[in-house]
């Protein structure tokens, strides 16, 4: 494949079914986590009555914990599929190695110049372009790892000493960061960080689908990338 994408063959099967399933599972989990996390951080006023009859915040916390498990397990599965799947499945995890290749950087700056409206047309790519790879690794992958680690550290506070979450995460994450409140704060800030990253991600995906001449959005549904008629 040339850096301009002239040697690509279409249609091409890019996103395997497990990658597509992971993508939409993570999207749904993140929506639940953002929604429930917002109310955990800014809970509604208390209501009168028996706690057993007014358990709304309890249900919200349970939904947050359940979605957190789905989020973490889906990410672990994604790492596994990066090992056994096709080359596009591991693009977002190999960015530090890709950066050692000078041609990768040439492609990176070509993509950046397109998004800055300096170049009218972007190069065609089967999977992620270089900027997307860097963003997915530096923002999504690292951000997700941070959210999982801090999330289970906070979860382990409630499950108390002796639980797997407390032993594997709480016991070292909270002392490392400083205290429980700081972990809450950084977990909260990273949630907003991932939220705005997702908004920008949606903008670029939709923009690329409109301007590139390739099927971008639909490829994450069908798995196939093709030239639009």
Model-derived features: where do they sit?
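Membrane-embedded alpha-helical bundles that constitute the cytochrome b-like, heme-associated redox core
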Residues: 1-229
